[in-house]
C-alpha cells in the first residue's frame, strides 16, 4: 500500500486529480482501447471533480475515450432526483467534460429486477477486461462504496441495506431527515473493487481518522471493509493531516519519507 500524507483536503484533491490525469494520458486511450475509470460520489471526491474539470478546461486531458463505472446508487431514486448519484455525477462532473454519455455507467436504482441489474453491471465491467483505476472515499465506519461493516470481502455488485450510521451521515443531503434517506442501495462489491488494476482512496478530516487507522495499521477485518486494501497489489491512499490523527507518529513519518524519496 502507498500512503500519501498531505497537509489539507485541498492538496488531496489536487494530488488525486493530477494522478488520474497522468494515468489517463500515459494510457493513451482510443475508441478501441478506452481507459476504464471507477468513480465515487460524496463530499470527499467533489473537489477532485472540480480539479479534474480545471485540468480538462486547461487542455491537459480529454475524457473522450474514458469509460466510467460509478460505485453505487440509491434504490428508489430516479435519475432526475437531485440526491440520486446519477444527478450528482452529471451535475458535478460529466456535464463539464467531453465524455460521451454512452461511456457513462451508473447502476439503475429504479430497476424492476435489482439482482439482474447488478449482474448486468458486473458483466459490463468484465466486457472491458478490467477497471484500470478505481477512485473512492471511505465512510467514518470504514466502509467503501456501500459495503457496510461485516460485508463480505469477496462480494460482488449487489443490493445492500444501509446502516443507521450511514443513514444519519447521509441525512444532511435529505433535509437532515433520516426518514427521507433511502434504506437500500446498489453497490459494487469489495471483490469488484479488488479486481481493479489500481485503487485510489481519498481520506480527509478528523472523522475519518479511525477508518484510516484500520486501513493502514489494523488487521484485515470485514468490520472495516477499507482494510481489504492491504491485500490489493496497487492501492494508493491519499490523506490530509487531520485524518492521520489516530496513526502512530512513526507510521506517518515512514510514509512521508517514502514520498520524499519518490519525489527525488
Swiss-Prot record:
Pathway where this protein functions: Amino-sugar metabolism; N-acetylneuraminate degradation; D-fructose 6-phosphate from N-acetylneuraminate: step 5/5
GO-annotated cellular components: cytoplasm
Single GO molecular function: identical protein binding
Organism: Glaesserella parasuis serovar 5 (strain SH0165)
Protein name: Glucosamine-6-phosphate deaminase
InterPro entries, per the entry: Glc/Gal-6P_isomerase, Glucosamine6P_isomerase, Glucosamine6P_isomerase_CS, NagB/RpiA_transferase-like
Lineage, uppermost ranks: Bacteria, Pseudomonadati, Pseudomonadota, Gammaproteobacteria, Pasteurellales
PROSITE patterns: GLC_GALNAC_ISOMERASE
Activity control note: Allosterically activated by N-acetylglucosamine 6-phosphate (GlcNAc6P).
Family: Belongs to the glucosamine/galactosamine-6-phosphate isomerase family. NagB subfamily.
Gene this protein is translated from: nagB
UniProt keywords, alphabetically: Allosteric enzyme, Carbohydrate metabolism, Hydrolase
Amino acid at each position: 500500500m502507498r500512503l500519501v500524507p498531505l497537509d489539507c483536503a485541498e492538496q488531496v484533491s489536487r494530488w488525486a486529480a493530477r494522478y488520474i490525469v497522468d494515468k489517463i494520458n500515459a494510457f493513451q486511450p482510443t475508441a478501441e482501447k478506452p481507459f476504464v475509470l471507477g468513480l465515487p460520489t460524496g463530499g470527499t471526491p467533489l473537489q477532485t471533480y472540480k480539479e479534474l474539470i480545471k485540468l480538462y478546461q486547461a487542455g491537459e486531458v480529454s475524457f473522450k475515450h474514458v469509460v466510467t463505472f460509478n460505485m453505487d446508487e440509491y434504490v428508489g431514486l430516479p435519475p432526475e432526483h437531485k440526491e440520486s448519484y446519477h444527478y450528482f455525477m452529471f451535475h458535478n462532473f460529466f456535464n463539464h467534460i467531453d465524455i460521451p454519455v454512452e461511456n457513462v455507467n451508473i447502476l439503475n436504482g429504479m430497476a424492476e429486477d435489482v439482482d439482474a441489474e447488478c449482474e448486468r453491471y458486473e458483466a459490463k465491467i468484465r466486457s472491458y477486461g478490467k477497471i484500470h483505476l478505481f477512485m473512492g472515499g471511505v465512510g467514518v465506519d470504514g466502509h467503501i462504496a456501500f459495503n457496510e461493516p461485516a460485508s463480505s470481502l469477496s462480494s460482488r455488485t449487489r443490493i445492500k441495506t444501509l446502516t443507521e450510521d450511514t443513514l444519519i451521515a447521509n441525512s444532511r443531503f435529505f433535509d437532515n431527515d433520516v426518514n427521507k434517506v433511502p434504506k437500500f442501495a446498489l453497490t459494487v462489491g469489495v471483490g469488484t473493487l479488488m479486481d481493479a488494476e489500481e485503487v485510489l482512496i481519498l481520506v480527509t478530516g478528523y472523522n475519518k481518522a479511525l477508518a484510516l487507522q484500520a486501513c493502514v495499521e489494523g488487521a484485515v477485518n470485514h468490520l472495516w471493509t477499507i482494510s481489504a486494501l492491504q491485500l490489493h497489489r496497487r492501492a494508493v491512499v491519499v490523506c490530509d493531516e487531520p485524518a492521520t490523527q489516530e496513526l502512530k507518529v512513526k507510521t506517518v513519518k515512514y510514509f512521508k519519507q517514502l514520498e520524499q524519496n519518490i519525489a527525488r
